[in-house]
Design a protein with these regions (language model features):
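Nucleotide-activated donor-binding/catalytic signature segment of Leloir-type glycosyltransferases, i.e.
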Residues: 229-247
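Aromatic "clamp/platform" in nucleotide-sugar-dependent glycosyltransferases that forms part
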Residues: 267
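Conserved donor-binding/catalytic core segment of Leloir-type glycosyltransferases
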Residues: 142, 173-205, 217
Length: 378
C-alpha cells in the first residue's frame, strides 16, 4: 500500500525504494501487487516488470480504499501486507488479519505544519504520532535509517520489531560529459515546501559576487515550483537559477556528473536517495544534520558536509566551490561511500523481513539479508 508509485509525477525517493523492493521480490518468485492512488494518464490496472499496479482513489480516499479492498479480498490471496506510511497509515489492520509490515521513511513531525498549517497539521501529526503506533502495536516495522528507527522509538514503537533496510545506490550510468568549467550546484528532488529549495537559491545569491558564473540547476517538479520561480525571478531571468523540470534518467545522471556539488537543504530526509546517486558521479553533498537520515547517507567531512544553520549551509557550499583540493577529497570519499550500499543487498534484507513476518517472527536487525533463505519455498 503506497500513496504513490514511481510513475507518479509527484513521486520521489520513497517511490524508487518501493519499485526496487517490489521488483526484488518478484525476482525471488513472489507475486507482488502495489495499490496506490490514481493519476492522470495511468492505467487503473497494469503490470510493470512483473509487479501489478492497481490504482484508485484520490490523495485522501486512497487510504480507506486500501483497507476496504483488503476486506473485500480484491487483491486475491494475500500472505503479507506492506503498509507504507508517508505520514498517514493505510489502516490495513482493519481490512486483514494477515501479517502487516509497516515501512516508514521518516517521521513528519516538522512537516505537518509546513504543508498543512493549523488544525489540519495538528490532526495529521496526531494520527501519525498517536493513532498509528496504537493501531499497529505489535506489528513489524521497517525503517530506512537508524535515525528513522530512533524517531519511531520516540513515538512508542518499542520492542525488537524495527528492522533497518537502507536504500541502495544505482549502478553508474555512463554519460559523455564532465564537470562544468564554471562553478555549478544542483538540487534534485520534489519541489515542495519542506524540501526548502529556497535555501539553495539564497546561498546562490549570496555567493554570486564571488562566483559570477555560478549556476544552480534545480531538477524535479512539484506544486511548489511556481512559488520558487517567484522567489527569485531576477536569478531565473539571468539564467543563474535554471529549472530543469522532470528529466529523463540519462539527463539526471548528466547533471550529477557536471555539478561541482549537490545541495540538499531538505527539512527532513529518511535517507536521501539522491545523495548516493550524486556520489556515484563523484559529486559531494551539503545537507542539514537535523534532516535525520543524512547522518548516515553522508559521512561528514569524508563524503560531504553536514551543517546546522542556513548560514552554515551557504558557507559550506562556498567553501567547496572555492577549495578545489577539498572538493576532490570529498568527491573521492563520496564515491567510495556509495559503494557500501547496493539495491541487491537491500532487496534481500527486505525480503527477509517479510519472510520472518509471514512466519510470525519479529526482527530488529539492520540490513540483515540471506537471499537464499529470504523467501521460504512454496
Amino acid at each position: 500500500m503506497s500513496w504513490r508509485d514511481s510513475g507518479n509525477p509527484e513521486g520521489g525517493g520513497a517511490e524508487r525504494y518501493l519499485q526496487k523492493m517490489a521488483t526484488g521480490l518478484v525476482a525471488l518468485g513472489c507475486r507482488v501487487t502495489v495499490f496506490t492512488v490514481k493519476y492522470a494518464g495511468a492505467p487503473t490496472d497494469e503490470v510493470i516488470d512483473g509487479v501489478r499496479y492497481v490504482r484508485a482513489g484520490s490523495k485522501l480516499s486512497v487510504y480507506p480504499l486500501a483497507a476496504w479492498n483488503l476486506l473485500r479480498r480484491r487483491f486475491g490471496r494475500v500472505d503479507v501486507v506492506v503498509d507504507i506510511q508517508n505520514g498517514l497509515p493505510f489502516f490495513t489492520p482493519l481490512g486483514t488479519r494477515r501479517p502487516i509490515v509497516v515501512l516508514v521513511h521518516h517521521v513528519h513531525r516538522e512537516q505537518w505544519q509546513v504543508v498543512y498549517p493549523g488544525r489540519g497539521g495538528r490532526i495529521g501529526w496526531w494520527v501519525e504520532s498517536r493513532l498509528a503506533p496504537w493501531l499497529y502495536r505489535g506489528r513489524q516495522y521497517v525503517a530506512v535509517s537508524r535515525a528513522t528507527r530512533a524517531e519511531l522509538r520516540e513515538l512508542g514503537v518499542t520492542g525488537p520489531r524495527v528492522a533497518v533496510v537502507h536504500n541502495g545506490t544505482e549502478p553508474v550510468v555512463s554519460v559523455e560529459t564532465r564537470k562544468t568549467a564554471h562553478p555549478s550546484i544542483c538540487v534534485v528532488g520534489r519541489l515542495v515546501p519542506h524540501k526548502q529549495v529556497e535555501h539553495a537559491i539564497d546561498a546562490t545569491r549570496a555567493l554570486l559576487p564571488e562566483f559570477p558564473e555560478l549556476r544552480l540547476r534545480i531538477v524535479g517538479s512539484g506544486w511548489w515550483e511556481d512559488d520558487l520561480r517567484a522567489y527569485a525571478p531576477d536569478l531565473v531571468a539571468r539564467g543563474v537559477v535554471v529549472f530543469e523540470g522532470h528529466v529523463s534518467e540519462q539527463r539526471k545522471q548528466q547533471i550529477y556528473e557536471e555539478s561541482w556539488v549537490m545541495a540538499l537543504p531538505s527539512l527532513k530526509e529518511g535517507w536521501g536517495l539522491v545523495v548516493g546517486e550524486a556520489a556515484a558521479h563523484r559529486t559531494p553533498t551539503v545537507a542539514y544534520r537535523s534532516a535525520g537520515g543524512t547522518q548516515e547517507s553522508i559521512v561528514d567531512g569524508v563524503s560531504g558536509l553536514l551543517v546546522d544553520t542556513e548560514h552554515e549551509f551557504a558557507t559550506a557550499l562556498g567553501d567547496l566551490l572555492r577549495d578545489d583540493e577539498r572538493r576532490e577529497v570529498l568527491a573521492k570519499g563520496a564515491l567510495k561511500h556509495s559503494y557500501g550500499f547496493t539495491w541487491e543487498h537491500s532487496q534481500a534484507a527486505f525480503a527477509r523481513v517479510l519472510s520472518e513476518a509471514v512466519q510470525g517472527r519479529l526482527i530488529d536487525d539492520q540490513d540483515a539479508a540471506d537471499a537464499a533463505d529470504a523467501i521460504p519455498a512454496g
